[in-house]
Amino acid sequence: MMLIRYLSQIGRYFLMLKEIFNKQTKWSVMKKLIFKEIDDLIIDSLGIVCFISFFVGGVVAIQTALNLTNPLIPKYLIGFATRQSVILEFAPTFISVIMAGKMGSFITSSIGTMRVTEQIDALEVMGVNSLNYLVFPKIIALLLYPFVIGISMFLGIFGGWLAGVYGGFTTSDDFIMGAQMEFIPFHITYAFIKTIIFAMLLATIPSFHGYYMKGGALEVGKASTVAFVWTSVSIILFNYILTQLLLGS
């Protein structure tokens, strides 16, 4: 019974994706909605992303240094490990999980509140495709999400450099040499491919849970929690699949 319910929800989700791109809202209206979503979802997230990235990058460098107890192991591996950790996993994946809480709860609660207050019903009565009106601007706004992850990568490595050098764990030259050593450009491509997929999940899964929720204010809170859980699970699952497909061979 539970399996049938889950499969039904997945089917409903894909039908929602199809409906989002039907009957487009006028560009003059859509343009304002897109800029509002960029402000709410991208600009407002930069502060927390920068803060977390900087300090986690520092922690990665310090923990790597503390585990290099053998004097024969070169110190430039601190920079190498920090770069690999930040670019491959921390910036694209774990920042996205954090954003599932920050962006996801905002999206679910805002759309859920509109459902509770019957604003979505009013849009439908006026002949507006409410899914296109509410969700499409979020998808377009989150096309800028790779820009946020790029900043996260830079600050993570910069935080690692500061912690490693000024913590006395390595020299600046060693860290930079390690950060440049055996660099594979495809790793950046891989990270941004993941980021684009995660951006789509961040825009649509919370929207789905907000749009189809039933009940009152209490249910809005519950829907936000469920949306966060399922967005996080989807991100981790797709992270595994994409890693296997893109790096497994």
Task: Tell what function each PLM region has.
Residues M1-I34, H209:
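Short, membrane-interfacial amphipathic segments enriched in basic
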Residues I42, L46, C50, F90, ...:
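Selective transmembrane-helix segments that form parts of the transport pathway or gating/packing helices
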Residues I42-F94, I98:
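Active-site cofactor/substrate anionic-group-binding motifs, chiefly glycine-
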Residues I52-F55, S96, F136-G167, I197, ...:
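Hydrophobic alpha-helical transmembrane segments that constitute the membrane-spanning cores
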Residues Q63-I87, F154-I196, M200, T204-A223, ...:
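Membrane-interfacial helix-loop-helix connectors in multipass membrane proteins
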Residues V97-D121, K138:
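Membrane-cytosol interface at the C-terminal ends of specific transmembrane alpha-helices
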Residues T113-V135, V220:
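Short cytoplasmic-facing helical segments at TM-TM junctions of multi-pass membrane proteins
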Residues V220, V226-Q244:
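Final/C-terminal transmembrane alpha-helix of multipass membrane proteins
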